[in-house]
């Protein structure tokens, strides 16, 4: 595994903490989640069962890893805080637990955050494509500030008001957001192409997009993406697998997009 990983890893394998598990065949319950940073790869299986099927020549392995120096920084922070560090996990696995669960389809998670937007194409619970683009909520704030000639504090307040006012309203994507959304649309299409052309994936066609992240509350973003890409787009609900008092529904719906990663991390040992 290390030999194959060395062809893909950005660092020497000796400088990384890695964990691997089989994608095909028997996998212990919850084993695939005990990981740091993930990327599927194909390993020669050593024997060929049925020459008619190219996939039979390989064993698919999910390898996860991170630089030892990065992991040590997190360990040191938790020691200073006098907290017991249980595990280090990736955003992708946390989001899969919180938003996809046991759905075995091909799904894209679009995490529209403050500084960047992350895209993950997930097939049968395994992330096969991970992309990131430096566009996020702060990009929207700066554009509002430039367009309206106001400071960024007021622009941030305007953005939040825009999100609140947009909930349940009719109409299309605000014009101010269109130039920001176009690079994200381009990245989505590129991720779709990467996934479709991967040799060892099975479904090939993404069935839906789940939208999450603190900036996903912006008005009409799901509708705009659905119309532009011709695919079903939903805002993710990280509370769908969580039992909570009904009188908290309004508050949880408001903070849900920002809590998906945290909820997924909390669900790590509950599967």
Report each predicted region and the residues it spans:
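Active-site neighborhood for divalent-cation/phosphate handling
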Residues: 1-100, 208, 238-242, 258-261
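Short, surface-exposed connector motifs at secondary-structure boundaries
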Residues: 57-58, 123-126, 201-207
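Conserved beta-strand elements of the Class I
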Residues: 62, 106-110, 210
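Glycine-rich phosphate-binding loop plus the immediately following alpha-helix
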Residues: 69-92, 126-164, 168
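Extended, charge-rich low-complexity interaction segments
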Residues: 73, 113-128, 254, 258-271
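Short, solvent-exposed amphipathic alpha-helical segments in soluble enzyme
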Residues: 78-80, 124, 225-230
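Gly/Thr-rich phosphate-binding beta-strand-loop-beta motif of the actin/hexokinase/Hsp70
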Residues: 100-129, 136, 144
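Helical "lid/coupling" subdomains associated with nucleotide-phosphate turnover
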Residues: 145, 170-271
């Amino acid at each position: 595994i290390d030999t194959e990983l060395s062809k893909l890893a950005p660092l020497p394998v000796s400088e990384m903490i890695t964990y691997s598990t089989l994608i095909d065949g028997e996998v212990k319950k919850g084993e695939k989640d005990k990981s740091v940073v993930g990327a599927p790869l194909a390993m020669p299986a050593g024997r060929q069962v049925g020459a008619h099927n190219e996939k039979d020549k390989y064993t698919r392995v999910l390898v996860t890893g991170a630089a030892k120096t990065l992991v040590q920084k997190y360990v040191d922070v938790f020691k200073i805080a006098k907290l017991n560090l249980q595990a280090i996990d990736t955003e992708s696995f946390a989001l899969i637990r919180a938003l996809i669960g046991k759905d075995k389809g091909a799904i894209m998670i679009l995490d529209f955050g403050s500084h960047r937007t992350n895209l993950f194409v997930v097939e049968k619970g395994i992330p096969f494509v991970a992309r990131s683009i430096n566009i996020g909520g702060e990009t929207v704030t700066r554009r509002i500030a430039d367009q309206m000639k106001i400071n960024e504090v007021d622009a941030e307040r305007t953005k939040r008001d825009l999100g609140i006012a947009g909930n349940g309203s009719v109409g299309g994507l605000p014009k101010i957001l269109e130039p920001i959304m176009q690079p994200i649309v381009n990245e989505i299409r590129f991720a779709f192409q990467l996934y479709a052309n991967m040799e060892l994936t099975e479904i090939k066609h993404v069935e839906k997009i789940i939208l999450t992240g603190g900036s996903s509350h912006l008005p009409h973003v799901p509708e705009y993406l659905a119309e532009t890409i011709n695919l079903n787009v939903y805002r993710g609900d990280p509370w769908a697998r969580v039992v909570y008092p009904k009188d908290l529904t309004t508050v949880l719906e408001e903070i849900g997009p920002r809590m998906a990663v945290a909820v997924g991390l909390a669900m790590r040992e509950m599967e």
